[in-house]
Amino acid sequence: MTHSVQPTPLQARKSPALQGRVRVPGDKSISHRALILGALSVGETTITGLLEGEDVLNTAKAMQALGAKVERTGEFAWRVNGVGVGGFAQPDAALDFGNSGTGCRLVMGAVAGCPIAATFDGDASLRSRPMKRIVDPLQLMGASVIASAEGGKLPLTLQGAKNPLPIEYRTPVASAQIKSAVLLAGLSAPGVTTVIEQEASRDHTELMLQHFGAQIVSVPEGVHGRKISLTGQPELRGAPVVVPADPSSAAFPMVAALIVPGSDLVLTDVMTNPLRTGLFATLREMGASIEESELRDDAGEPMATFRVRASKLKGVTVPPERAPSMIDEYLVLAVAAAFAEGTTRMRGLQELRVKESDRLEATAAMLRVNGVDVAIEGDDLIVEGRGHVPGGGLVATHMDHRIAMSALVMGLASDQPVQVDDTAFIATSFPDFIPMMRRLGADFA
């Protein structure tokens, strides 16, 4: 199952000041989870502000294939009538998650707790990504792999557990996907399922499980970790969910406003969950003018309005423990670092190697081809900022939406235009990115 979309190259050119007030699309992590937990609940769940990108829509299709009723009731407005915990039905065909590792891995967890078999598949990029570390704990809980591609990759057929077992599991890396898969499988198990993390990963699953009525406790573990315990076999009840704007998507117009001289942007309803705001903290350390106002929350998730103005940035060192709170933002942070004065060292980025592409190498290549001095030392990325970027390069996106958007942001302030080989995959997370940036003043051709 591969995308047959024709490549759509695009060029970004030095732009006038970016101005305006926008709400970027709904958060992708929350959107996936709202659909999945709505499907595992009894009764009706209404979702406002759902991200209608390809990744999330593939999760919606999977929930329908597993027996839930999922319907669009208006723009970004959806309704889910769930089947209850353990109530998924055997799907008639393979579940195709396209480019989405999050959707695929979370649904694996939910299916593992049901006595059904389901085949998981995706595009060429998703087929290349590791699944073993998701499947390993699910097998401890009673699920089994009937078939998979070499190395335990997709396409993969998972047989859910007839009698799921609660486990205590220590995650090998800080990964919200591993944690969430175990917790979603644990919903069907009697007793308490516990996940221990050495480094705390994003906690959207825990917050939303509470919102839907699960009994879940999270306590500190060690210096940076968490211990999360879920009581199994709850009756989850449908609930309203307002999806905040995605901080990972807000990162692109935010960095663009910082590097394009004279820019002044307002970004509304951006999620400010502390486990997702590593980029905002880092940009402020670099000297960015970012003001927060209108703080509120919904379904346990805080949000705020941000005013971002063009700023003179300086190089900083980003500690490795910040990685889980900004794992998707390092690409666009590297762009900000290239326009800063001085050296920026981003430490401990090993997880970037197993994303939609090897994002560590791809980020270095994106900068290098545009005249930026960059190095990789172990799992660290080092960018030598000189206050400007020569540009003029052609960036290979490797079917990765975040590389495409980061390169386009860079071209808005570089000396020469930046060419991107393909923008088709931007639709996976931010379908409106190009028209929205144009409305703010971006020069794309």
Swiss-Prot record:
The active site is at D328 (proton acceptor). GO terms for molecular function: 3-phosphoshikimate 1-carboxyvinyltransferase activity. CDD domains: EPSP_synthase. The keyword Amino-acid biosynthesis applies. Phosphoenolpyruvate binds at K28, G101, R129, Q177, R359, R402. Pfam families: EPSP_synthase. One of its GO terms (biological process) is amino acid biosynthetic process. It catalyses: 3-phosphoshikimate + phosphoenolpyruvate = 5-O-(1-carboxyvinyl)-3-phosphoshikimate + phosphate. SUPFAM superfamilies: EPT/RTPC-like (SSF55205). It is an enzyme of class 2 (transferase). Pathway: Metabolic intermediate biosynthesis; chorismate biosynthesis; chorismate from D-erythrose 4-phosphate and phosphoenolpyruvate: step 6/7. It comes from the Bacteria. It is found in: Cytoplasm. 3-phosphoshikimate binds at K28, S29, R33, S175, Q177, D328, K355. One of its GO terms (cellular component) is cytoplasm. Keywords: Amino-acid biosynthesis, Aromatic amino acid biosynthesis, Cytoplasm, Transferase. Its EC number is 2.5.1.19. Catalyzes the transfer of the enolpyruvyl moiety of phosphoenolpyruvate (PEP) to the 5-hydroxyl of shikimate-3-phosphate (S3P) to produce enolpyruvyl shikimate-3-phosphate and inorganic phosphate. Belongs to the EPSP synthase family. Monomer. This is 3-phosphoshikimate 1-carboxyvinyltransferase. It comes from Rhodopseudomonas palustris (strain BisA53).
